Amino acid sequence: LSRTQRFNIRKIEETSIADALQRKYGVQPIDSQTIAHLANGNFIKALETIHLNEENELFFNLFISLMRLSYQRKIREMKQWSEQLAAMGRERQKNFLEYCQRMIRENFIYNLHRKEMNYMTLPEQNFATRFAPFVNERNVIGIMDELSEAQIHIEQNVNARMVFFDFSLKMIVLLKQ
C-alpha cells in the first residue's frame, strides 16, 4: 500500500456521451440519449451497448419467452426453450443469465416509479409496464437466487439443458408468488 494512490474519476455527463455518440458514431439522437443513460457515465459501456445490440436483442427475446412460458405453464415449450439455450455455448449462457439478473433488478425497481433509477432500453421499458408487477418483494430474492444458482451450475459445467429446464420450472412457482 505504500506506493498506491487512489484517484476518484467522476462520471461523464449523459449529455456529453450522447453528443459524442451522435457526432462520432452516427447514432440517432433518441437512441444516443437512451444509450447514454444506460451507460451510467461510462463511455466504454456506451460503446459496448452499441456493439452488443444484436446479442441483447436475442437475450431480451429469450427472457420474454421464458417469462411468458413460465406464466402460462407451457412445459413442452419450456423444454424447447431450454434446448435452444443449451445450444448457445457456455459464455453466452452465462451472459444470458447476467442479462436476466439485470432485467429482474430493473423490473423490481420499475415498480418504485423512479425513472432515473431504471436503466432499460425502450423495448425493455415497454415490456416492464406489463411484467414489472410480477416481480415483487415476495419473489425477487428467490428469482435472483435461482439465477445465481443456474449461473454457478453453468460455470461448473453442469448439463445446460437440465439447468435451464430446472430454472424455468422454478420460475413457474416464483412468478405466481
Predicted feature descriptions by range:
Residues 1-99, 103, 110-177:
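Charged, glycine-rich active-site and insertion segments that engage polyanionic ligands
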